[in-house]
Swiss-Prot record:
UniProt signal peptide: 1-27
Disulphide-bridged cysteine pairs: 109-127
Source taxonomy: Eukaryota, Metazoa, Chordata, Craniata, Vertebrata
Record gene name: Fgf18
Superkingdom as given in the UniProt entry: Eukaryota
Physiological role: Plays an important role in the regulation of cell proliferation, cell differentiation and cell migration. Required for normal ossification and bone development. Stimulates hepatic and intestinal proliferation.
Record's keyword annotation contains Glycosyltransferase: no
Subunit structure of this chain's protein: Interacts with FGFR3 and FGFR4.
Disordered: annotated span: 157-183
Protein name per the record: Fibroblast growth factor 18
């Protein structure tokens, strides 16, 4: 004969079902949070305070610095070259940046063919890049509009087209350097040492 399940068996089944539901909810929350972060990384933020920094980008491949020569882009600039001084505006908390040549006031952009070009107006999404700090301490710049396309240069300092670049290629690796003679801008963050607060002794008053 068929025997009804015991109360203990029912409780165990309910417990297992509850654990499964909790795991499903946790997985959904993790996916939703990851999607939220990715969306925020790609979305421009007009509320947060933008930061403007001045530095050079040293190309690991060419051994020189990125230059914004008007509409033409290269990586042949010497240390301190006026065309290699870049004004970098942080666009969002997700490390989106816009890069402008200080001398020419043209923006570094990547067009739909993956070619690096300079533009006088940097409001287009083609002029926004996602800054990635790599494990080797180099920085890579991926196009915010064309995912997977990176700013890259050959050994001769010529721009590489976006579709031919990958994050692990040395061609897309850069090192931030402050302009020659302006080392005072490179100030390390200073930590304040907090000492243990001494106990306050109250003065005694005669009764």
């Amino acid at each position: 004969m068929y025997s009804a399940p015991s109360a203990c068996t029912c409780l165990c089944l309910h417990f297992l079902l509850l654990c499964f539901q909790v795991q499903v909810l946790a997985a959904e929350e993790n996916v939703d949070f990851r999607i939220h972060v990715e969306n925020q990384t790609r979305a421009r933020d007009d509320v947060s305070r933008k930061q403007l920094r001045l530095y050079q980008l040293y190309s690991r491949t060419s051994g020189k610095h990125i230059q914004v020569l008007g509409r033409r882009i290269s990586a042949r600039g010497e240390d301190g070259d006026k065309y290699a001084q870049l004004l970098v505006e942080t666009d969002t908390f997700g490390s989106q940046v816009r890069i402008k040549g200080k001398e020419t006031e043209f923006y570094l952009c990547m067009n739909r063919k993956g070619k690096l070009v300079g533009k006088p107006d940097g409001t287009s999404k083609e002029c926004v890049f996602i800054e990635k700090v790599l494990e080797n301490n180099y920085t890579a710049l991926m196009s915010a509009k064309y995912s997977g396309w990176y700013v890259g240069f050959t050994k001769k300092g010529r721009p590489r087209k976006g579709p031919k670049t990958r994050e692990n290629q040395q061609d897309v690796h850069f090192m931030k350097r402050y302009p020659k003679g302006q080392t005072e801008l490179q100030k390390p963050f200073k930590y304040t040492t907090v000492t243990k607060r001494s106990r306050r002794i109250r003065p005694t008053h005669p009764g």
